[in-house]
């Protein structure tokens, strides 16, 4: 479909490192993709979003299942608040690796990032050599042909698109000060403006016709810069296919992988261009911040079971809340669209940039072990409970912090996120849970006759408090004889850990996938993913062969690669 561009068009060319070069030389000095004519065009209002029902999961995990009597679902305000944590419904794509959609370019299907929520703190860690000209920064420009010839293998540079306008203004990174002033950008937040800018940028095919393929973005909230990434790949591992710090030698690609860090890059936010399709939606639809003072839980048997009570939960020891946040993103069960197998030709030439669709490549739809919380156990040790169960209720714990794989480490709303209406204060985890006793009376769940407990949910100090209390006298007659040994665990409005008593919970927990007893997962936090068992999909995909000019024959060398932008940027 050809996009009808409205407004002034600007012809752009690939970035040049030297302004004095001749026209002939600059044709070879631009982005190596010059020959491919895969370029960008500003999207116009009639341009379809390209969200394909065949490639994007539309089926969300239902929050209302087994929620009879759940006060977090009965109250409209609370139900709306809890639904934002349903990443299957609101994000609809991979998180660790997001390649959730397929788009056709020149008769071939390619995969693109497609998630609808920003991924806070996500960055790509490069394993280039620790020597010039390598900088191990994925936000560096993609390499020019000249830069590659000077460095040799592995490739230098990073993933950033390096096109410029005739006036010399770079397309990426683009200053937020300019996006704020631009009438084409309607978003109300800095992050939304960057996402919208990415959504208005699409690839062109070899005939200079607009496609529907869009590129991911990274917003740097510290520098207020919007990066458009020309490389959609997010993970490449294995010494047969890529090198780590130059070993093994002579491989075209260096290895790289998505990361979140305990101490660094919290100001970077990775997202697909589709966050910008409705650039203000993420403010209320996505779990952008961590939730302080509560454990995620699932409503069953008339009470809220936090993740430590679910049989398929993974529990690991951590030294800090930040490590639990990292684990929520990097654990082996998190939603990922990474393909299952490596192509045999991945090192045949230096041309792997766009992910190529293959039949064995998964579309996770956002389903995965995307949820977790930090808590302190009865011995005083910090623990991280990880689950694939979408939370539909909360258990009070003043020492706990609940995380999602998409959200930030921050327990407050970042100051650069502003509401659509400036007169309205942006919601925080605290204000979102406010209640009044007259409108939120005490409610009780059904009696769990095994534990002889029922859940009491009430409004205390303007906050929802969920605690476990004894069943009524009549209900206690139906409880087992050992009730006294496992009851009475609610202290000061905080539900303690050992609701099932002792260590029997972990002794009985089974690994859902293998059907055998599961380990307690009490090992120390490991920052090196290579020391752990990789998920089956931790493999690369074949990518666009036409990025490098040598991959195509009979490439037209007349004229430059063009970028068309609606209006002035």
From Swiss-Prot:
Q: Which domain of life is it from?
A: Eukaryota
Q: What is the effect of changing residue 51 to K?
A: Mislocalizes to the endosomal system
Name the residues of the propeptide: 49-66
Glycan attachment points: 86
Q: Where is the composition biased (Basic and acidic residues)?
A: 518-530
Give ranges for the Extracellular compartment.
49-483
Q: How does it sit in the membrane?
A: Single-pass type I membrane protein
Is the keyword rRNA-binding assigned to this protein? no
Region (DII) location: 288-415
UniProt cross-references to Pfam families, sorted A to Z: AMA-1
Q: List the ranges whose topology is Cytoplasmic.
A: 505-569
Q: Where is this region: DIII?
A: 416-487
Instruction: Give the positions of the site Cleavage.
Output: 487-488
Query: Got any disulfides in this one, which pairs?
Result: 117-286, 194-226, 242-255, 304-393, 324-384, 435-459, 447-471, 452-479
Q: Where in the cell is it found?
A: Cell membrane; Secreted
Q: Is Disulfide bond a UniProt keyword of this protein? A: yes
Do you know which SMART domains this protein is assigned to?
AMA-1 (SM00815)
Q: Give me the ranges of the annotated region Disordered.
A: 518-548
How would you summarize the oligomeric state and partners of this protein?
Component of the moving junction (MJ) complex, composed of AMA1, a transmembrane protein on the parasite surface, and a complex of the rhoptry neck proteins RON2, RON4, RON5 and RON8 localized to the cytoplasmic face of the host plasma membrane. Interacts (via ectodomain) with RON2 (via C-terminus); RON2 serves as the receptor for AMA1 on the host plasma membrane. AMA1 and the RON proteins are initially in distinct compartments within the parasite, namely the micronemes and the rhoptries, and interaction happens only upon initiation of invasion when the micronemes and rhoptries discharge.
> What is the recorded name of this protein?
Apical membrane antigen 1
